[in-house]
UniProtKB/Swiss-Prot annotation:
SUPFAM superfamilies: BRCT domain, Fibronectin type III. Residues 287-566, 588-620 are annotated as: Disordered. One of its GO terms (cellular component) is trans-Golgi network. This is Cell fusion protein cfr1. GO terms for biological process: conjugation with cellular fusion; Golgi to endosome transport; Golgi to plasma membrane transport; Golgi to vacuole transport; intracellular calcium ion homeostasis; intracellular potassium ion homeostasis. Residues 472-484 have a biased composition (Acidic residues). Residues 382-392, 517-537 have a biased composition (Basic and acidic residues).
């Protein structure tokens, strides 16, 4: 109690929870009102004493120290252990790492990461249950530095760094084999092979470090695990191949699945072959009959070819061998000549085909002496060229029609009578019909002249312009055109219809010209509805006709009629041609009017080249 202090104070004011006390020296003291006596009011004088309680103080300090020691012993002495990283397996391109279970003590885990060359490459998921990791895609024969870092609430704890080097291709110690369904003999061979190549011990279950799954047949739980883990499923021959070559080989040709599918396909093919064996035996027994029939058909098909070849060869041998000798007689008609040459060409093309039996003509040639040399025949070469031209002309539809007409004419005409005499006989029988049709032609000519007169009245100015242009064109015309115009004018000066004698003479000349110029007429295109207004005879065809003396050359003049009127006149003339059943050739040069000038030439409107007369209309 010696340490007790006692003093007297007076209460100045009492508020809620707080009292103001005054000391004798007039110091103000704030004192809790709860500690005042219950009957104390403002102005009351009270005594206050204070002392130090050391015993209680020591007891409390001792209790506090005990609690601190207990906490330290529980949470402060056992820290988390750093992870221990180890190598499980290393191959040419992969490394498998493993570590011991983590010792965290009382700390909580934050993360577990794997570092390669001080770079984080993998964050381990479920670190409390996962104790290994596999890194693939590494380089051959290369060193790598790995470490595992543990992060907890008690701090960060890294593992020791380990250096691992990948294997070379000739190092087979990294092979880790897991076996599946194995035949006992193959299992023994596998164990011996593993010992010879110093590979890792054989596993019976698929693990993270398994590199190859070896089995004799597919199926089983371990087979499915290996398939899910993308582990190559191979046969025993793969390890034997690696052992024989002393290096790691490619696995593409040793998959057990491909081998199983091959065996299945082979079994299926064997079954199908066995099923098809019986029908094939029956077919072979019936084969001689079929071959005999085929041989008979082939012999019958080749018989006509042999006869034609013999005929052509005999005709060729009959011809003179020297070019200076007199040539043989030509065929009666050009059509017959083209047929003979084309057949000869067909025989040559057939003889050039391989793998065909030699014909009788070839046997005859083989019997001839080797010293005999065949000389060139110019007449035969000309026949071949004509046949080629004739075949090219026959490819067009127009030429095909004309060739059919010519063939019919040659069949109907007797070869002993000349063409001109036969035409005259036919025309003498048809003279009454031609006399009746001349009146209809004159009516058509009068209708055409009336149309021309109507157009002259409406287009006077255009006629003057066209006369100037036609005069300029006449100055530039060639001498051949001037001669042709003079021939037209001489024909225009003739008056009155032609007599029967002239008609018969012209028909005879036209038929003779048609017979002599079959090939020229074939070259001329047929008139159709589309090109009837624009067709023009080629100058070459006109010159050929003039040289033969059958029909005189008619000049080409412009058309004065409008397109519609000209078309109507052409239709009328075509109708007359069909009724007369005569060969009429319409020669017309059409000029379409342009926007700049209404071209109405001051020339002949239309000239009709016929086998019985030449008609024309002259416009001044």
């Amino acid at each position: 109690m010696d340490d007790t202090n006692q003093f007297m104070v007076s209460v100045a004011k009492i508020d809620a929870g707080m009292a103001i006390l005054l000391t004798p020296s007039f110091h103000i003291i704030e004192f809790p009102s709860v500690l005042l006596p219950n009957d104390a009011t403002a102005g009351s004088i009270i005594d206050i004493s204070v002392h130090h309680n050391k015993e209680e103080e020591i007891a409390r300090e001792t209790a506090f120290d005990d609690v601190q020691k207990e906490i330290f012993e529980t949470y402060g002495q056992k820290l988390p252990s750093p992870p221990v990283l180890k190598l499980k397996n290393a191959t040419q391109t992969s490394i498998v790492l493993e570590w011991d279970p983590l010792q965290l003590s009382t700390a909580r885990l934050k993360s577990l990461c794997l570092y390669r060359n001080n770079v984080r490459v993998l964050n381990i998921s479920n670190p409390m249950t996962t104790h290994n990791a596999k890194l693939s895609g590494l380089s051959l024969d290369t060193e790598y530095d790995f470490s595992l870092v543990l992060d907890t609430t008690a701090g960060t704890f890294p593992s020791k760094h380990i250096t691992i080097k990948t294997l070379r291709m000739i190092d087979l110690t990294g092979i880790q084999v897991c076996v599946g369904n194995m035949v006992p003999n193959e299992m023994e061979a596998l164990q011996k092979c593993i010992e010879r190549i110093h590979a890792r011990p054989i596993q019976t279950s698929v693990r993270i470090d398994t590199t190859h799954f070896i089995c004799s047949s597919t199926g089983g739980p371990e087979y499915e695990k290996a398939k899910a883990a993308n582990i190559p499923i191979l046969g025993l021959d793969y390890l034997l191949k690696c052992e024989s070559e002393g290096r790691l080989v490619n696995v593409s040709g040793f998959y057990i699945e491909n081998r199983a599918s091959y065996n299945a396909n082979a079994s299926i093919n064997s079954v199908e072959a066995a099923q098809n064996a019986a029908p094939n035996l029956n077919a072979t027994t019936e084969q001689p009959k079929n071959t005999a029939e085929v041989a008979q058909g082939a012999a019958s098909a080749k018989a006509p070819q042999q006869t034609t070849q013999q005929g052509t060869q005999n005709s060729a041998n009959a011809e003179p061998s020297s070019s200076a000798s007199v040539p043989a007689e030509a065929p009666e008609t050009e059509a017959e000549q083209s047929i003979d040459v084309s057949s000869d060409i067909g025989l040559r093309s057939d003889s050039s085909k391989p793998n065909e039996a030699p014909t009788s003509s070839e046997n005859i040639k083989a019997d001839q002496p080797e010293n005999s040399t065949k000389q060139e025949n110019p007449e035969e070469d000309m026949q071949i060229k004509d046949a080629e031209e004739h075949s090219n002309l026959e490819s067009t539809p127009a030429a095909q029609q004309t060739s059919e007409v010519e063939a019919n004419n040659h069949q109907e005409k007797p070869s002993s009578l000349p063409a001109v005499e036969q035409i005259n006989v036919n025309e003498e029988n048809n003279t009454p019909e031609t006399e009746g049709l001349e009146d209809e032609k004159e009516e058509n000519n009068t209708a055409a002249e009336s149309l021309i007169n109507q157009e002259e009245t409406t287009s006077g100015e255009a006629v003057t312009k066209s006369t100037v242009e036609s005069s300029a064109n006449e100055e530039e015309a060639e001498p051949n055109e001037i001669i042709e115009e003079n021939a037209v004018k001489s024909l225009l000066n003739q008056e009155g219809p032609a007599t029967n004698e002239e008609v018969e003479k012209n028909n005879a000349n036209s038929e003779n010209a048609n017979g002599l110029t079959d090939e020229k007429i074939i070259e001329a295109p047929l008139d159709t509805k589309e090109n009837s207004d624009d067709d023009k005879p080629s100058p070459a065809a006109a010159e050929d006709i003039g040289t033969n003396g059958a029909i005189e050359e008619i000049p080409q003049v412009s058309e004065v009629l409008e397109p519609e009127k000209a078309h109507t006149t052409n239709l009328q003339l075509n109708a007359l041609d069909k009724e007369e059943d005569l060969n009429i050739t319409t020669v017309k040069q059409s000029s379409e009017p342009t926007a700049d000038d209404n071209l109405i030439p001051n020339k002949e409107a239309e000239i009709i080249q016929s086998s019985d007369e030449f008609e024309s209309v002259n416009i001044d």
